[in-house]
C-alpha cells in the first residue's frame, strides 16, 4: 500500500486534532468556526472554509477521513499538492454556498460542519477521471464502477435533500459535487455545461 500523500495526511491529522478540541471546548469552536446562517448574527467570512475542519461526531469524522484517504490520496498523487488543495477549496466553498442558500430559503438557524462537501467533490472527480475503476463501498458492500457509485450517491443525496429531514446537509454535499464538476471542466478548458466535443 503506497504511503498517504502529504496534504491528505496533514488534513486527516488536522481534522482529528480539531475534533479532539471540540470534545473539550465545543461551544467556543462551533460558535466561531462552524458555518452559521447570516441571519443568526453568528456568521463570519472565514466560516465558509473553517466549517470543513469541524465534525459533528466520531462517525462523521471517521467516514469523511476514510473517504479523504480512499479518493483524495490518488487524486493528490495525480494532480500534485497545489492543484489538489485548490480543488478541495473549491469543493468546500461550493458546498458552503449551497448550504447558505438552502438555510436562507428555509430560514434555518442551524450551523453546518464537516468536510463532506470537499469529499463529495473528490468523489465526483474520481468518477470522472476513473469511471470504470471498480470500488467496493462500506455500505452496501457491492462492487460497482466508480461512475455508477457517483451517480447512485448523488441521486440519493438529491432524494434525501428533497424529501428527508435527517439533519444532514445534503445540498451542501451536492454543492460540493457541482463545485468539483466545474473545476474539472475548467481545467479541461471546457465551458461548464457545453457538450463534449467529438
Regions inferred by a protein language model and the residue ranges of each:
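A detector for small-residue-rich transmembrane helices and their helix-helix packing motifs
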Residues: 1-198
Amino acid at each position: 500500500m503506497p504511503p498517504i500523500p502529504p496534504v491528505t495526511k496533514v488534513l486527516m491529522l488536522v481534522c482529528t486534532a480539531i475534533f479532539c478540541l471540540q470534545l473539550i471546548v465545543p461551544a467556543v469552536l462551533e460558535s466561531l468556526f462552524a458555518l452559521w446562517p447570516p441571519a443568526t448574527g453568528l456568521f463570519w467570512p472565514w466560516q465558509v472554509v473553517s466549517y470543513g475542519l469541524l465534525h459533528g461526531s466520531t462517525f462523521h469524522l471517521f467516514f469523511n477521513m476514510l473517504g479523504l484517504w480512499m479518493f483524495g490520496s490518488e487524486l493528490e498523487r495525480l494532480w500534485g499538492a497545489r492543484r489538489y488543495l485548490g480543488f478541495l477549496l473549491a469543493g468546500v466553498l461550493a458546498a458552503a454556498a449551497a448550504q447558505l442558500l438552502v438555510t436562507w430559503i428555509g430560514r434555518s438557524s442551524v450551523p453546518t460542519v464537516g468536510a463532506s462537501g470537499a469529499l463529495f467533490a473528490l468523489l465526483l472527480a474520481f468518477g470522472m477521471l476513473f469511471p470504470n475503476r471498480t470500488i467496493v463501498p462500506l455500505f452496501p458492500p457491492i462492487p460497482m464502477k466508480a461512475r455508477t457509485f457517483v451517480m447512485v450517491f448523488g441521486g440519493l443525496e438529491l432524494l434525501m435533500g428533497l424529501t428527508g429531514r435527517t439533519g444532514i446537509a445534503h445540498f451542501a454535499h451536492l454543492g460540493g459535487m457541482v463545485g468539483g464538476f466545474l473545476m474539472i471542466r475548467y481545467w479541461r478548458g471546457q465551458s461548464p455545461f457545453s457538450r463534449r466535443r467529438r
